[in-house]
Amino acid sequence: MDDDKDTIFTFELYLKSIGYTTVSFFNPIEALGYFNKNFATCSLVITDYGMPQMSGIDLIKKIREKDENYTKKIILISATVKGDILTDYYEELSNLKVNKILEKPMSLETLKNAIRTLIK
């Protein structure tokens, strides 16, 4: 989930090339609707922090309302990881059991390693 089409396209193309099945969204509300309908088949959510319709943190809160046992892995990506996210939202992200925070831009190798660490 990212509102940047280039990021989505790059991630999706790469992840499919290394064997992952992906479903991508530019709109967090549509992503949440898909997640709620397909909860059983989703194992990992990758979401951007800053999006116009809903923040990544708000999206994660909604996901965790459905995923009360924290079974779904979550990677939060952002261009502002070193700033406000880690300082202002650290406790909240910990409570929401965000599994990994990655700073954009990142290498595809970094993304792959983060996913492989979470999904074995």
What are these regions, as identified by a protein language model?
Residues 24-44:
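Acidic, metal-coordinating helix/loop segments flanking the phosphotransfer/catalytic sites
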Residues 103-115:
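C-terminal output helix
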Residues 6, 27-30, 55-61:
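Acidic catalytic/metal-coordinating carboxylates
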